[in-house]
Amino acid sequence: MNEYTFIQVDVFTDKPFGGNPLAVFPDAEGLTGEEMQSLAREMNLSETTFVLPPATAGADFKVRIFTPAAELPFAGHPVVGTHWALAHLGRVPLSGPITQVRFELGVGVLPADLHVVNGRVERVVMTQDRPTFHAILGDVTELADGIGLSPEAITETGMPVQVVSTGAPQIMGSLRSLAEVQALGAGKLNTAVLNRVCRAAGTDIA
């Protein structure tokens, strides 16, 4: 049986056990897509990434992104986390205050700038495609039920709830207050309802 190393990183935080966790397999060559999906299911995190040699000119690495349920063409949190992980492992030569690295993803080759301070990556700035705007959700009752809030928490902002994509479509909306945003959490989410809303909108809960 082959052995593959992985590391787990917390993205969007500077504190241990904070942010959004991600599993990264930095040397995934030899794994099939089915095996990657099985490993992502076993990790049971929002996403797991698998790093491969690039197949496209101009790319430094090929990265495949999986949720426990499916492969994604693109997602921000795993891309940022994988850039940091590869730099941390010494896989990216850090030259000067900014080092650019290009990932081959399901949506194409996208660059990111690694901002370096005292030899360490302090920030990852990712470039995405221009946004495209799609369907507006007219009735947000089911969406509100899925996130554990009242429909009014969404509708009283006066802002539309719309599917927007910079590579992977997502439902974008706003809430009345920061307190309502901070109150969101896994304990209040109804994933069955959210999956149904996302499928109807042509997107994914991740």
Protein language model features and the residues they cover:
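Active-site proximal loop and beta-alpha junction motif in alpha/beta enzyme cores
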Residues: 1-74, 80-206
